[in-house]
């Protein structure tokens, strides 16, 4: 009927369809002047790509490109002195065998 829910519960199998791979934190400081820190926790071993793009999607800095990382906490410092002020995005792409890739981005603002 109209307005009634279609799914009563999520099965344990459905919960495994999207693995908990990482936690991507907001860069600090944000907004920033010249340098900012990008941090993430990796909850299980994965192949990662981590990069910074401008507002049009062009990659400005690639920290890693399909490299294998062990679980743990990671920090990357990005120096933007050679770039224009504006909005940038940092993106992590994680792949674990048996799952589709997971892509997550956050926005940061560079001010001079």
PLM ranges: what are they?
Residues 1-6:
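Surface beta-loop-beta hairpin patches that serve as ligand-binding interfaces in beta-rich domains
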Residues 42, 68, 80-83:
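Residue-level recognition of secondary-structure-to-loop junctions
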Residues 9-28, 32-52, 75-78, 93-99:
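Glycine-centered coil/turn sites that cap beta-strands in beta-rich domains
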Residues 27, 52-60, 88:
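Short, glycine-anchored, charge-dense loop/turn motifs used at functional sites
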Residues 70-74, 84-87:
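A glycine-anchored, Pro-Gly-centered beta-turn/N-cap motif
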Residues 56-59, 73, 99-100:
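Residue-level signal for well-ordered, solvent-exposed loop/turn and beta-edge residues enriched
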Residues 60-69:
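Solvent-exposed serine/threonine-rich low-complexity stretches and specific carbohydrate-binding patches
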């Amino acid at each position: 009927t109209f307005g009634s829910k279609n799914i009563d519960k999520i099965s344990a199998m459905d919960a495994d369809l999207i693995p908990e791979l990482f936690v991507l934190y907001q860069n600090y400081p944000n907004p920033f002047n010249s340098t900012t820190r990008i941090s993430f926790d990796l909850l299980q071993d994965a192949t990662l790509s981590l990069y910074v793009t401008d507002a049009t999607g062009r990659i400005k800095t690639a920290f890693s490109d399909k490299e294998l990382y062990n679980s743990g906490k990671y920090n990357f410092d990005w120096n933007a002195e050679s770039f224009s002020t504006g909005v940038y995005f940092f993106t992590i792409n994680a792949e674990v065998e048996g799952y589709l890739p997971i892509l997550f981005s956050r926005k940061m603002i560079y001010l001079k």
